[in-house]
């Protein structure tokens, strides 16, 4: 579908392919394999001489529709879908790098991503150096002759730190490396990293792309050349997105723009309200003028997003007390749901990290009733 259409139209129409039955809603192909018309056709498919599905570990028509839609939303040449966001990150490294090479990564990233880089990839000879997400000079200083990848979340999980993606892209390319951006906190409705110079965009489709906390999924996007290596890892190792999950994500993307507008509006209102509360030590939300990278965020993002981080003056005990006192907020580590969620990252998603790496904030996604609910919990 021509990308001259607006994002709202692409979210509904891009990637749709009808079967011979001309269904209006995209079809879900629940099958492990596909039948060939002849031995010659089977051979041609496996050699890559003829297009068409072969085996569901390789791909599936429903998955392909989901990939095409997300590629249109991100402005990417190609998307490769995975069973989870973490599988997508692993595939990016394993598909494009080899032992003896080096990653420069933001030190403010998801806890499982730190575990992956430090404890798993390190065993296979891929070294990682962690640097400040907000200081491009640290990224430049960390570059080695064998550096192949820069990895960053912007905004970061959970402190919503915003990185200068244009600056990081320039430093990475000067070093002969790629810049990969985890765009989970924004989605393409709010930020398109490829337009800012990134080479690779990564998603946990579990979050805003699904939008209702129903299924797991992941995706890696970029040029055809880069994605060929990522796809080779998928085809060989098999962290494949199921047709059912792809269909759910495909339908979830139809309302992405509407949901992100509402998430952003509600999060801003919550952040503004939290700034007035005496028990709150600080509020971290990119849409607030008080956020350290507010000006930068507004040059990269459409809005501040749907996630608000805040610290209470009473520390962990106060945070737990608040969380336990809420009634209409779900205590869960997921984000991007239509239901408001709340968690304490230092003792959940980032609990296995060293103490100096843990965020002290409470972390929330918001609905329009969130200030009332937090108020009832006696912040």
Q: Where do the language-model regions lie?
A:
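Conserved small/polar residues in nucleotide/adenosyl-binding loops
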Residues: 377-379
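Short, well-ordered beta-strand elements within core beta-sheets of diverse protein domains
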Residues: 249-258, 306-313, 369-373
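Acidic-histidine catalytic/liganding microenvironments
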Residues: 73, 274-278, 326
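Conserved PLP-enzyme active-site core in the AAT-like
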Residues: 2, 11-17, 78-279, 284
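N-terminal "arm"/small-domain region of PLP-dependent enzymes with the aminotransferase-like
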Residues: 2-60, 365-370
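Conserved N-terminal alpha-helix of the aminotransferase class I/II PLP-enzyme fold
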Residues: 38-87, 112-119
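Conserved C-terminal alpha-helix-loop-beta "cap" of PLP-dependent enzymes
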Residues: 282-369
């Amino acid at each position: 579908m021509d990308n001259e259409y607006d994002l709202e139209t692409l979210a509904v129409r891009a990637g749709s392919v009808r079967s011979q039955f001309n269904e209006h809603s995209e079809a879900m192909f629940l099958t492990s394999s596909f039948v060939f018309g002849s031995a010659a056709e089977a051979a041609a498919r496996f050699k890559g001489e003829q297009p068409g599905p072969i085996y569901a570990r390789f791909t599936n028509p429903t998955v392909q529709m989901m990939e095409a839609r997300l590629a249109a939303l991100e402005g990417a040449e190609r998307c490769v879908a995975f069973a989870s966001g973490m599988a997508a990150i692993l595939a990016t490294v394993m598909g494009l790098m080899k032992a003896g090479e080096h990653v420069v990564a933001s030190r403010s990233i998801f806890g499982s991503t730190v575990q992956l880089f430090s404890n798993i990839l390190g065993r296979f000879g891929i070294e990682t150096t962690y640097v400040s997400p907000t200081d491009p000079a640290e990224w430049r200083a960390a570059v080695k002759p064998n550096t192949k990848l820069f990895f960053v979340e912007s905004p970061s999980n959970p402190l919503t730190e915003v990185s200068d993606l244009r600056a990081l892209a320039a430093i990475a390319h000067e070093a002969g490396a790629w810049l990969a951006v985890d765009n989970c906190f924004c989605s393409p409705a709010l930020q398109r990293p490829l337009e800012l110079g990134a080479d690779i965009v990564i998603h946990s489709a579990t979050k805003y792309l699904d939008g209702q906390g129903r299924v797991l999924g992941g995706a890696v996007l970029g040029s055809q050349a880069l994605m060929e290596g990522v796809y080779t890892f998928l085809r060989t190792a098999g962290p494949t997105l199921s047709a059912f999950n792809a269909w759910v994500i495909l339908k979830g993307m139809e309302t992405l723009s509407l949901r992100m507008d509402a998430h952003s509006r509600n999060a801003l209102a919550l952040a503004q309200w939290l700034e007035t509360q005496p028990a709150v030590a600080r509020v971290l939300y990119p849409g607030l003028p008080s956020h350290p990278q507010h000006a930068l965020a507004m040059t990269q993002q459409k809005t501040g997003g749907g996630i608000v981080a805040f610290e209470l003056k009473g520390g962990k005990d106060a945070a737990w007390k608040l969380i336990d006192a809420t009634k209409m907020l779900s205590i869960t580590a997921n984000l991007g749901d239509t239901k408001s969620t709340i968690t304490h990252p230092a003792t959940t998603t980032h609990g296995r990290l060293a103490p100096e790496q843990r965020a002290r904030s409470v972390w929330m996604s918001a609905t329009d009733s969130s200030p009332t609910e937090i108020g009832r919990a006696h912040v």
